[in-house]
A protein has these predicted regions:
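Acidic/polar loop-and-plug regions of large Gram-negative outer-membrane beta-barrel proteins
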Residues: 195-199, 211-281, 294-329, 374-413, ...
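Acidic, small-polar-rich N-terminal luminal/periplasmic segments of exported/outer-membrane proteins
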Residues: 23-157, 520
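Gram-negative outer-membrane beta-barrel transporters
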Residues: 436, 536-540, 555-637, 670-673, ...
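Outer-membrane beta-barrel translocator/receptor signature
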Residues: 121-124, 135-213, 219-223
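C-terminal beta-signal and adjacent terminal beta-strands/loops
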Residues: 630-635, 653-700
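Structural signature of Gram-negative outer-membrane beta-barrels, strongest in the C-terminal barrel
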Residues: 218-220, 329, 348-350, 356-360, ...
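Membrane-embedded beta-barrel scaffold of Gram-negative outer-membrane proteins
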Residues: 277-303, 477, 483-485, 511-590, ...
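Face-selective signature of the C-terminal outer-membrane beta-barrel domain
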Residues: 274-296, 321-453, 571, 579
């Protein structure tokens, strides 16, 4: 508590220091216009995208609606350099430039690392920042991050937006966005949604609810307060896909079979999220903010999945494994920063200074399956093509015809209680050297203190890491609408991992993994409505130490990922819009003996995304798109492969009036069988069959 008090004091002192400085900046040239026109929430500074020495993609709420996106995965599939992982059927999982993550998600800049499917109903925009960059986000972000920016109260406006949708699988959704402003100094906004989930796979169903009231208060001409509470309630069936065969590829003949229990393969989440943000303008050249977040998460997931399948010897049998896992996590975060703009000699500086404190308490336990017939966590069942396995509610018949019962309470695998204190301080300077050159330099210091109490093994481990993460970039602007940049940045990941279930290594002496990103890119705003960007990059992962007696540290200790990305998006003319991208990825794994000659998992060499729409009349438009993903390896041993695929989607839009829009989206028009992602060797996801979604947006 003493440390927390110190950090709260440090955050507040930022404002006090800035207030004192206000009386000392009379000699500074006032350049404050740009200070109050923030472009990207997660950058912390009001820098136009074209002046950011990093690959950045911003997806607005309008585009989310127009494209019919319903999940983070939908967005990721259209961002070059990114692809989805399966997430075991209960969480968002993204592969950022070859680096898989289930934790590098942020909500209005706050760390949002619990594993779940994040909703889109209350978002202003989604920001994707590629490449490790600890200066902005601290630990993790080893391949990039996704930041969701929520809608906030709008002063002086009153409106109600309604949305409803239904699809051919039987799923429905309802949504409301209501803003109420009684005067020019206060506004209240409520976003809420309900969604009933269905898809093409047997037994899959679920529902999710989101409720997000917010309030905005203009306390003075210089100070604004935003308050937010969000409630999330989710439940859905877990489907971990189908096995791979002798050729290492998903067995197409098994695509109608669900390898799980129709009653027990389920995940539940309940979350309560509180946020407060104070923004204050000290002068035309100095502004600051103080933000606080508290999140209370209660997560459960239990499942059976295919753990072993031998197509050559026993093609009609599969071995199932499983577990039930619970997580209760409380996450408190407080951060503050000050941005000041000033001149020295012939240079203009935008200086960012900030501090952050995170206090996390996480209780996690896992019980493995235990079958009475095998007296272990695994049991073998017969497969009948197109029919469900003989397992319902934990009871069934094994491949030998014996009645078998599973018990989720007998075999404790893990029971851990984790406490984390993370403290950070960062400083960055954006320097306008001349009309054509901008330099960005900065660094962040993170102190990560973790205590893991493993109740099962009666083992308590402690570890404290202190890491400095630099960032540097140089931008050349041959003209105002074009930038060429070279950048270097770093991040790190403690050996406790992204979900910090344990501390690997003997005597807790292993230093964090480090990630380095070197990137060269170009951004060109062709006009106000059309932009082009391209970049080449290299990400190197380094594990400085291994522990001979700890198998978890002896797998792949280093990797190198190289890539190229290009994207064009915007309006070709008043009627025709386009969003097209191409990504190329290559990489190698390195172990203690050197280059293994193996390619990292989930690293498709080529990915292509195209979406174009054309307004045939002032009221009617059509859209058409295609997504291509090259084959990729499911595992690091390169023994299992996801085949390449191409998916074609289409859409139609009809504007009934200025206040009413009807949209039809058709996914997988050619009804192609494809496998978009996987979690491990015998868990390949089956892509959705052709389906249509009709939606209506109505403004009152």
């Amino acid at each position: 508590m003493k440390k927390l008090t110190l950090y709260i004091s440090a955050c507040i002192s930022l404002f006090a220091g800035a207030a004192v400085a206000e009386d000392q900046i009379e000699e500074v040239v006032v350049l404050g216009e740009v200070l109050f026109q923030d472009q990207i929430n997660s950058l912390k500074t009001p820098t136009p995208v074209i002046n950011v020495p990093q690959s950045v993609v911003v997806v607005s709420s309008e585009e989310i609606t127009r494209r019919g996106f319903t999940s983070i995965g939908d967005i990721v599939n259209h961002v070059p350099g990114l692809n989805t992982s399966q997430g075991e059927g209960h969480r968002d999982a993204v592969v950022f430039r070859g680096v898989r993550s289930t934790a590098d998600f942020f909500l209005d800049g706050f760390r949002d690392d619990v594993q779940y499917y994040r909703p889109l109903y209350n978002l202003e925009q989604v920001e994707v920042l590629k490449g490790p960059n600890a200066l902005l986000f601290g630990r993790g972000g080893t391949g990039g991050v996704i930041n969701r920016v929520t809608k906030k109260g709008s002063l002086g406006e009153n409106f109600t937006d309604l949305g409803a949708a239904a699809d051919t699988f039987g799923g429905v959704s309802l949504q409301i966005d209501r803003n109420m402003s009684a005067n020019e100094t206060s506004a209240f906004r409520v976003n809420a949604h309900y969604e009933s989930l269905e898809n093409h796979r047997d037994f899959f169903d679920g529902d999710q609810i989101g409720f997000n009231p917010t309030a905005k208060f203009k306390l003075s001409e210089a100070t604004v307060l935003d308050l937010s509470y969000e409630y999330i309630d989710q439940e859905r069936f877990i489907d971990r896909g189908i096995p791979t065969g002798t050729d290492g590829r998903p067995v197409r003949a098994l695509r109608e079979t669900v390898f799980g229990d129709p009653l027990l393969n389920t995940t539940e989440l309940e979350a309560n999220l509180f946020k407060a943000l104070v923004q204050h303008r000290f002068s035309d050249g100095i502004k600051g903010n103080l933000s606080v977040f508290y999140g209370d998460y209660d997560k459960l997931y239990q499942n059976f999945y295919a753990a072993k399948y031998n197509q050559a010897e026993t093609p009609n049998e599969v071995t199932l494994d499983g577990y039930v896992d619970t997580t209760q996590r409380e996450n408190f975060q407080i951060s503050g920063n000050v941005i000041t703009e000033f001149q020295t000699a012939n240079a203009t500086h935008t200086l960012l200074f900030g501090v952050e404190f995170i206090d996390t308490a996480s209780d996690q336990d896992r019980f493995n399956t235990y079958f009475d017939t095998s007296e272990s966590d695994k049991e073998t069942f017969s497969i009948s093509e197109g029919l469900p396995l003989a397992l319902v509610g934990g009871r069934g018949t094994n491949s030998e015809g014996q009645a078998t019962v599973n018990d989720f309470t007998l075999k404790l695998n893990d029971d851990t209680h984790v406490e984390i204190e993370a403290r950070s301080m960062y400083l960055q300077d954006e320097i306008q050297l001349s009309e054509k050159f901008i330099a960005v330099v900065g660094a962040r210091y993170d102190e990560f203190d973790i205590k893991v109490n493993n109740v099962k093994s009666a083992d308590i481990r402690n570890r404290k890491d202190g890491e400095v993460s630099p960032r540097a970039g140089l931008i050349y602007k041959p003209q105002e609408n074009t930038s060429i940049y070279l950048s270097y940045s770093e991040s790190f990941l403690p050996r406790s991992g992204e979900q910090f279930a344990n501390i690997n290594g003997d005597k807790n002496q292993l230093d964090p993994d480090t990630f380095e990103n070197l990137e060269l890119g170009i951004k060109w705003n062709v006009n106000e409505a059309l932009s082009l960007s391209a970049s080449v990059f290299e990400i190197d992962k380094k594990s400085p130490q291994v522990a001979d007696s700890d198998p978890s540290t002896l797998d792949v200790i280093e990797s190198s990922i190289d890539g190229f990305e290009v994207q064009i998006q915007g309006q070709l003319n008043a009627k025709w819009s386009i969003n097209a991208s191409y990504g190329y990825l290559d990489g190698e794994q390195v172990n203690r003996s050197g280059n293994t000659g193996l390619r990292p998992r989930e690293l498709p060499e080529n990915t292509i995304s195209l979406w174009t729409s054309y307004q045939l009349t002032p009221k009617f438009g059509l859209g058409l798109g295609a997504s291509y993903q090259d084959e990729s390896f499911i595992n690091n041993s390169n023994s299992a492969t996801l085949p390449s695929y191409t998916r074609i989607d289409a859409a139609a839009y009809y504007e009934v009036s200025e206040d009413l829009m009807i949209q039809l989206h058709v996914e997988n028009v050619s009804d192609r069988v494809y496998f978009p992602n996987a979690h491990s060797t015998h868990q390949a996801s089956v892509g959705e069959e052709v389906n249509a979604r009709l939606s209506v947006q109505w403004t009152l």
